[in-house]
Amino acid sequence: MAKYMISGSKGGSKKPYVPKEMEDNLISINKIKVLLAVSDGECDPDFTLRDLYLDDVPVIASDGTVNYEGVTAEYRPGTQTQDYIQGFTDTSSEVTVARDITGDNPYVISVTNKNLSAVRIKILMPVGIKTEDNGDLVGVRVEYAVDMAIDGGSYSEVMRDVIDGKTRSGYDRSRRIDLPKFDERVLIRVKRLTPDSTSSKVTDKIKLQSYAEVVDAKFRYPLTGLVFVEFDSELFPTQIPNISIKKKWKIINVPSNYDPISREYHGSWDGTFKKAWSNNPAWVLYDLVTNQRYGLDQRELGIQIDKWSLYEAGVYCDQKVPDGKGGTEPRYLCDVVIQNQVEAYQLIRDICSIFRGMSFWNGESLSIVIDKPRDPSYVFTNENVINGDFQYTTASEKSMYTQCNVTFDDEQNMYQQDVEGVFDTEAALRFGYNPTSITAIGCTRRSEANRRGRWVLKTNLRSTTVNFATGLEGMIPSIGDVIAIADNFQSSNLTLNLSGRVMEVSGLQVFVPFKVDARPGDFIIINKPDGKPVKRTISKVSADGKTIELNIGFGFDVKPDTVFAIDRTDLALQQYVVTTISKGDDENEFTYSITAVEYDPNKYDEIDYGVNIDDRPTSIVQPDVMAAPENVKISSYSRVVQGVSVETMVVSWDKVPYASLYEMQWRKGDGNWLNTPQTANKEIEVEGIYSGNYQVRVRSVSASGNASPWSKIATATLTGKVGEPGAPINLTASDNEVFGIRVKWGMPEGSGDTAYIELHQSPDGTVENSSLLTLIPYPQYEYWHSTLPAGQVVWYRIRSVDRIGNVSSWTDFVRGMASDDVESVLGDILDKIFDTEAGQEIKENAIDSANKIKDQAQSIIQNALANDADVKWTRVQNGKRKAEYGHALELIANETEARVTQIEELRASIDGEITSSIKTVQEAIATESETRATQIQQLDSKFTKEIDGVRKDTSASISDVRQTITNESEARAQAVQQLDAKFTKEINDLDGVIKTEVEANISEVKQAIANETEARVQADQALTARFGDVESALVEKLDSWASVDSVGAKYAMKLGLTYKGQQYSAGMVMQLSQGSSGLISQILFDANRFAIMTSSTGGTFTLPFVVENNQVFINSLLVKNGSITNAMIGNVIQSNNFVQNQQGWRLDKNGIFENYGSTPGEGATKFTNEGLKVKDANGVLRVEVGRITGSW
């Protein structure tokens, strides 16, 4: 039997699958709609969802990743005509439909109402469940779409949506379909895209529950930037997210030549603007000031702002500087949101602080200055500052900050506030740790925050303030301008002369009145007439320091007394920024006080580029003891000058620290030490030396005047010129020059090393009586010796002295004489007379002088009588007879003056031809610039009568004016009186009108003047009488003055006639004055006859002195010294000790000359036309020549 293996397994129970049901996840969701007003005014139109941030996360990232689904947004740039945002807010009318939407049965909504803005559909899914094969209950997915056909056109899809999830209780959602513009109708078709389910396991029907016809409110909000954001509430279930937008914002006015994207300025700006986006702080400021919606000009006052200074600031802000990461960036940007109302002044200051600016009102407009590199606009020195006084104030060390913590909005961290610390190590070593903090307005870059902090530290460390007062030059600089200050007190404690006023500028040479401590390579700065300083390089300075030569001329006319300053290579001018300018009060209205703060021109490269530049010192600190020069060397060289070999000694030495000048002394053999002019060089040349042994020593001098000990004496034997200098040749002295002698000479060949000519004078041509007259610089070849009396004789001799003190031999004496030619002397005196005021006075005829005085008096009277006061009249009339009284009283007090005027006038007349009047005017005026008091009295009478063709007019008047005037610079008092009497007769006959005029006039003008430059008193009086064509005048003029450049007195009395068309004159003028022409003391007479008369007790007159028709007659004359060109003897000429036949001498008109000597009884001599006779002491005739008579 076969065996079978039976096998099997143990049976058991398997746990059955339990179906699962997912939770309902289709829940009706609300839409979040947010409308943000993001800007007042037009903004840049570009906007995408990449610019929109929800809780600091962009809706769409820069790489295109969508961070938030279902977010929509609309943007309006804030234009005047912008469209409204659809869907916010609206009114609607809902229509119930409750129709299933299947793939074969879409639903069409017809819209014909053109006022509708949109149609809002509501889709309902009553149940959305799917049963899986394993019994699980899950959600369904149904996709649907909305098509639109416009005015009979074809359908196009406008929206596609999907419902994905599970719901048992039903789920609905609303979707807005915006309507376009149409003419007739719009068809909206709602269709199902997911095929309809045929399985009982799937329940996914959808239906159009209803639709609403929507009319938007259509609020455009013109000129307001808008952002509308819409998203499902499920994205942020707990709270509304923080919504922010990062984009270009405001469109503002920018220059027409400006590209805000590349930040470049093309060509020159014509002052016009265009609209564009910009975050340049200068143009942001311009918008804030000029905008009439939200800016400073909301009242539409037309606020003026200096756009040219803003242009300068804008260009500076856009310049590229290192960004600290290897690239570049604009220097300053303004990324700021102004959300609240703020004070305008504070806002302007905050915006200006972005670009280191300062705002001020310049009298016409709001002006902006920025702290940037700039040249000084004017130079102030001790010369053009009142009292030469600069007052300095230095801040406390506590305010010297060494660390600055800058708070800014970091763009790399979603504009969260951060702090950038800036530390100055060098300052901390000096002042310690001293922090400060600032908030950087509009700053979003860490690199810019660092620059702002560095600027705070560098600027604050230069905190010295200067105050000074000046004259009208204070009107030249403006707030924010850089000025240069040359203060000899501050720079060198008066040890250096580095500023002053020029005497003259000629070509490349500048002449100054004192020694200037300038050197070649230094700079001289001069203020141009328009105020702008001009700098030129110095090529050479004369030995006396008074002549400066330039490399290049100034190119404009430099007036004398123009201020200059020296900018040395080792000592810079101080520079300051003007912060305030204030005008003086009434007493000092032409003075200006200026306050300025220290300016550092080197800080900008350190702030922007981190470059440290060593500053030149503005003051010098020198050692008390100077070192002596070392390595003193002596050498020589020769050169040929005009065929003559000239040897030159050269002395050199090493430079000494802190030395500004050097002094050298030398001597030949054992002679005296000779000085050379101080020099800033390390070498001196002595030209024209002679052969011999020379010794030299040198010492250094500091700028403060400290001198070192002399160096060791250096010795050398040099081969130079042999012998002595050549003596001058051809010495002459004139004898035909009036009141002087002209001395001339020549020089021999080889005299090029001559330094000067030594001129001696002698009254008699002897060495014993000679004396030094003067030293004449070579190569001058003549000398004018004046003033000498006519006929004076002087003897002269000269010798030459070379540059190193060697002297030539003396020339022989030559004789010179001041001319004794009377005709030449009188001609010269006459020319000098007419060059003086007295000469011009006596030259003018008295009638012309009288007319000038008369016209001056009438002008003063008429000007004083001019008055527009309203005179009230009282009149009484009886027929042709009229009596009138006028009176005016006027009182005025207003913003510019106080004035009181009183006028009183009395008139009496008959038929208008016989009149008499008295007028009195009194007036007192006080204004801000002048006071004036005037008193006038005028008496006037007129009589006119005509009988039988003969008309006679007579008039008489007296005018009297008293006036005082004072103002800030002058006081004046005037007294004018004029008496006038006239008679006119006219006869009408067949031949015409015969007119005769007779007039007598006295005019007197007196005035006293005192002002800043002179005091003067004048009294002029003129008496004139005229009958027809015949006229006479008497004039008396008194004048006394004292001024800054002259002092003197003058008196004139003149007579004048006009007779038969010819003028005649007589007069006298006296003048005594001292001025630029020297002392003038003279009395001048104009007369055909000038006589001095004496009278006796019996009434007899004699004439001791008479000038008649150009001849002088003298009755008796005693002359000590006299010179006669031609003389005639009318009787005899004899010595004053003459005694007939005893002593003295005598020459008579018959030609007999007798000479008895000075002692009686010593013999005698007698000359006649017939012979010569001599007798001895006993009276015996001893000699007889010619005709022999044998008797005396």
Curated annotation (Swiss-Prot):
Ubiquitinated by the Bil antiviral defense system; about 20% of CTF is ubiqutinated when the Bil system is expressed in E.coli MG1655 and infected with this virus, or when this protein is expressed in a strain with the Bil system. The keyword Ubl conjugation applies. It is found in: Virion; Host cytoplasm. Keywords: Host cytoplasm, Host-virus interaction, Late protein, Repeat, Ubl conjugation, Viral attachment to host cell, Viral attachment to host entry receptor, Viral genome ejection through host cell envelope, Viral long flexible tail ejection system, Viral penetration into host cytoplasm, Viral release from host cell, Viral tail assembly, Viral tail protein, Virion, Virus entry into host cell. Residues 628-722, 727-821 form the Fibronectin type-III domain. Belongs to the Caudoviricetes tip attachment protein J family. Homotrimer. Attaches the virion to the host receptor, inducing viral DNA ejection. During tail assembly, initiates distal tail tip assembly. During virus entry in host cell, strongly binds to host receptor in an irreversible attachment. The binding induces structural changes in the tail leading to viral DNA injection. This is Tip attachment protein J. It comes from Escherichia phage SECphi27. The gene is J.
